[in-house]
Amino acid sequence: MDLWNWDEASLQEVPPGDKLTGLGAEFGFYFPEVALQEDTPITPMNVEGCWKGFPELDWNPALPHEDVPFQAEPVAHPLPWSRDWTDLGCNTSDPWSCASQTPGPAPPGTSPSPFVGFEGATGQNPATSAGGVPSWSHPPAAWSTTSWDCSVGPSGATYWDNGLGGEAHEDYKMSWGGSAGSDYTTTWNTGLQDCSIPFEGHQSPAFTTPSKSNKQSDRATLTRYSKTNHRGPIQLWQFLLELLHDGARSSCIRWTGNSREFQLCDPKEVARLWGERKRKPGMNYEKLSRGLRYYYRRDIVLKSGGRKYTYRFGGRVPVLAYQDDMGHLPGAEGQ
């Protein structure tokens, strides 16, 4: 094919539907007749015509329900008798929200439950039918709701009255002894048996709160161990300054008269006082001197040469630096 002289290719033609039918027959394909006759009118599709040809659906249920005859009062099936009673009552705000079942007859030889004939707040007894549908019926007049009144007598006893005109029975009584050492007795009369629980009496001062004793012990502890005004753990150089400012300790430590220089006159006593402050009874001068050597490279405490047990404070002690600026030397105070 010549690229410089080429003619535009003709468009491909699609054969009509009548020709497609014959063409598909050669290869075994089926082509629907898509060609429209010239005299076939095109009308809009209506609702009735558009559903023609679809199979009609059967909306009847496959398994029809049997007709259940309606009863005004379904028969309640009793449950087996059980001594373990659970909460069978319904919520008083919505008595229709739950359904319970009535217990069956009690077997011979067992006492009736105190809850037989119990009713809800609406005066109706719930029952459950065979289909599980709760039904409510009005009870007979003999099962009417009984109200109980409570009254307290002059002797401290509690009386319960059911409002039927009978005698009031003492159902609950508590007696408390007022004097020290008396017995406190609590008595219940439940109709089945009498229960009494004795309690040994105790004197009222014995039931004191431990706050007073704790405060007294804390106060004694503060009085015993509060020997300094420093906040937090005290350091060794601070303790030595405290002893130097205390005139009563001049026999064990004192200023030498030179600037910031002091001498340990009794090193054992100073070590003992330091161990008492830090609550270390095994403190001695060897351990104290190791603590002082720790301050050498920090310019807090330095060793003075030529004299034994003689040290001086360095320039990083803020209290002594302030006194030097004001013109008051520590050595002048001791002289």
From Swiss-Prot:
Report the superkingdom from the record.
Eukaryota
Biological function: Binds to DNA sequences containing the consensus pentanucleotide 5'-CGGA[AT]-3'.
| PANTHER family given in the database record | ETS, ETS TRANSLOCATION VARIANT 2
Which terms under GO biological process does the entry name? blastocyst development; blood vessel morphogenesis; BMP signaling pathway; erythrocyte differentiation; hemopoiesis; in utero embryonic development; mesoderm formation; Notch signaling pathway
Does the keyword field hold Zinc?
A: no
**Molecular function (GO) terms listed?**
DNA-binding transcription activator activity, RNA polymerase II-specific; RNA polymerase II cis-regulatory region sequence-specific DNA binding
Keywords (alphabetical) are: DNA-binding, Nucleus
Q: Under which name does UniProt file this protein?
A: ETS translocation variant 2
Extract the InterPro entries matched here: Ets_dom, ETS_fam, WH-like_DNA-bd_sf, WH_DNA-bd_sf
> SMART domains from the xrefs?
ETS (SM00413)
Q: Where is this region: Disordered?
A: 94-138, 201-220
Where is composition skewed (Polar residues) in this entry?
A: 205-220
Look up and give the organism this protein is from. Mus musculus
The gene from which this protein is expressed is: Etv2
Residue spans binding DNA: 234-314
Q: Where in the cell?
A: Nucleus
Tissue specificity statement from the Swiss-Prot or TrEMBL entry: Testis.
Instruction: Write out the similarity annotation.
Output: Belongs to the ETS family.
Q: Name one GO cellular component term.
A: nucleus
